[in-house]
């Protein structure tokens, strides 16, 4: 299990990609691509737009409050435990399995926010990750060599337990 020490959490305040204020703005970027959502609101917005993420990673909360708007989930559902501020082996294994079970929702007991990092390694080049940036909007990042390098660098700030 990897744990992000509190003193390093500031590193994750900056978005990994381009921020959009409205979900409809990302539609041209995900058309015909494998895309994954991390977060309940982003996953809800995709499903409400009639789009089924290849992998949706949710925890039932947004801004630490229960999120009750989720439409009916499509595809397989995997349940994992991943405490806040961590990336567990269980989460990584579920994300890998989800790639074989598309479409799949990974339902996290704990917190899903950091799932973006392992997804950069698991997804193929050209896949797209969408996640929410509180008070800013929706972040879109395309998986490529540069994104993987950025994620790998951020992982050096974690402690292995």
UniProtKB/Swiss-Prot annotation:
Its EC number is 2.7.1.237. It catalyses: 3'-dephospho-CoA + GTP = GDP + CoA + H(+). It is an enzyme of class 2 (transferase). GTP binds at residues 40-42, 59, 112, 135. GO terms for molecular function: GTP binding; kinase activity. Pathway: Cofactor biosynthesis; coenzyme A biosynthesis. Signal peptide: none annotated. Keywords: Coenzyme A biosynthesis, GTP-binding, Kinase, Nucleotide-binding, Transferase. Pfam families: DUF359 (PF04019). GO terms for biological process: coenzyme A biosynthetic process. It comes from the Archaea. Catalyzes the GTP-dependent phosphorylation of the 3'-hydroxyl group of dephosphocoenzyme A to form coenzyme A (CoA). Belongs to the GTP-dependent DPCK family. This is GTP-dependent dephospho-CoA kinase. It comes from Methanocorpusculum labreanum (strain ATCC 43576 / DSM 4855 / Z).
């Amino acid at each position: 299990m990897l744990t992000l020490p509190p003193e390093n959490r500031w590193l994750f305040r900056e978005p990994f990609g381009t921020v959009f204020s409205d979900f409809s703005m990302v539609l041209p970027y995900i058309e015909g691509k494998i895309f994954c959502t991390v977060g309940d609101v982003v996953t809800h917005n995709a499903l409400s737009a009639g789009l089924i993420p290849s992998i949706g990673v949710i925890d039932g909360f947004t801004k630490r409050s229960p999120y009750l708007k989720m439409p009916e989930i499509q595809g397989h559902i995997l349940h994992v435990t991943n405490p806040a501020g961590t990336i567990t082996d269980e989460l990584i294994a579920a994300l890998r399995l989800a790639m074989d079970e598309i479409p799949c929702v990974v339902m996290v007991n704990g917190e899903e926010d950091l799932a973006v990092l392992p997804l950069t390694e698991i997804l193929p080049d050209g896949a797209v990750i969408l996640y929410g940036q509180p008070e800013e909007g929706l972040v879109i990042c395309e998986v490529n060599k540069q994104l993987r390098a950025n994620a790998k660098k951020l992982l050096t700030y974690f402690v292995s337990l």
